[in-house]
Amino acid sequence: MAGRSGDSDEELLKTVRLIKFLYQSNPPPNPEGTRQARRNRRRRWRERQRQIRKISGWILSTYLGRSAEPVPLQLPPLERLNLDCSEDCGTSGTQGVGSPEILVESPAVLEPGTKE
């Protein structure tokens, strides 16, 4: 469950509980009061949320040795990607996506020099 060798599941769960507690300790602001009071409460709430995000990132990097940001997914080169409908077409709701059966010619309206 932890995803890295050396990390115990219990340590990960304890860290997640701590971060969850931090977020639960800062509920959304009360929507009552004057416009200025609501604006001030939202501003203070957003600042606390930013602090909680920073603290959560620090906790993850310090206790688990990983960053709060996800690791970017490595994609294959575009040259290796293709649309091939020769295998099992239509099972995922994409029937006819790769078949070039219908040819559409550009309409004469878009040709240069024609006016209505």
Swiss-Prot record:
Where the record places motif Nuclear localization signal and RNA-binding (RRE) is: 34-50
Which residues are annotated as modified residue Phosphoserine in the UniProt record? 5, 8, 92, 99
Q: Which domain of life is it from?
A: Viruses
Q: Annotated Gene Ontology MF terms? A: DNA-binding transcription factor activity; RNA binding
Q: Where is this region: Disordered?
A: 23-48, 90-116
Subcellular location(s) of the protein: Host nucleus, Host nucleolus; Host cytoplasm
Residue window of motif Nuclear export signal and binding to XPO1: 73-84
Q: Which Pfam families match?
A: REV
- GO cellular-component term (any): host cell nucleolus
Bias class Basic residues marks the residues at: 36-48
Q: Where is this region: Homomultimerization?
A: 18-26
- Major localization listed first in the record, in broad terms: host cell
Q: Which InterPro entries match?
A: REV_protein
> Which keywords does the record carry?
AIDS, Host cytoplasm, Host nucleus, Host-virus interaction, Methylation, mRNA transport, Phosphoprotein, RNA-binding, Transport
Q: In the UniProt entry, what is the domain comment?
A: The RNA-binding motif binds to the RRE, a 240 bp stem-and-loop structure present in incompletely spliced viral pre-mRNAs. This region also contains the NLS which mediates nuclear localization via KPNB1 binding and, when the N-terminal sequence is present, nucleolar targeting. These overlapping functions prevent Rev bound to RRE from undesirable return to the nucleus. When Rev binds the RRE, the NLS becomes masked while the NES remains accessible. The leucine-rich NES mediates binding to human XPO1.
Q: What else is known?
A: The OYI isolate was taken from the blood of a healthy Gabonese individual.
**Function text:** Escorts unspliced or incompletely spliced viral pre-mRNAs (late transcripts) out of the nucleus of infected cells. These pre-mRNAs carry a recognition sequence called Rev responsive element (RRE) located in the env gene, that is not present in fully spliced viral mRNAs (early transcripts). This function is essential since most viral proteins are translated from unspliced or partially spliced pre-mRNAs which cannot exit the nucleus by the pathway used by fully processed cellular mRNAs. Rev itself is translated from a fully spliced mRNA that readily exits the nucleus.
Recorded protein name is: Protein Rev
The record lists the organism as Human immunodeficiency virus type 1 group M subtype B (isolate OYI)
